[in-house]
Amino acid sequence: LHTKGSVPLDTITFYKVIPKHKFVLVKFDTQY
């Protein structure tokens, strides 16, 4: 899981892959 290097890319991918799990994105943002 490379979230420290692919934060913006992961965000877009997450939005397209898991648009219903917006809370997951928030959690990733908090960790970042």
Swiss-Prot record:
Residues modified to Phosphotyrosine: Y32
Top-rank taxon: Eukaryota
Positions in coiled-coil regions: none
Keyword Amino-acid biosynthesis: no
GO biological process entries: protein secretion
Protein localization: Endoplasmic reticulum lumen; Melanosome
Listed GO CC annotations: endoplasmic reticulum lumen; melanosome
Entry keywords, A to Z: Endoplasmic reticulum, Phosphoprotein
Main localization of the protein described in the UniProt heading: endoplasmic reticulum
Reported function: Does not seem to be a disulfide isomerase. Plays an important role in the processing of secretory proteins within the ER.
Subunit-level organization: Homodimer. Part of a large chaperone multiprotein complex comprising CABP1, DNAJB11, HSP90B1, HSPA5, HYOU, PDIA2, PDIA4, PPIB, SDF2L1, UGGT1 and very small amounts of ERP29, but not, or at very low levels, CALR nor CANX.
Name under which the protein is recorded: Endoplasmic reticulum resident protein 29
Source lineage: Eukaryota, Metazoa, Chordata, Craniata, Vertebrata
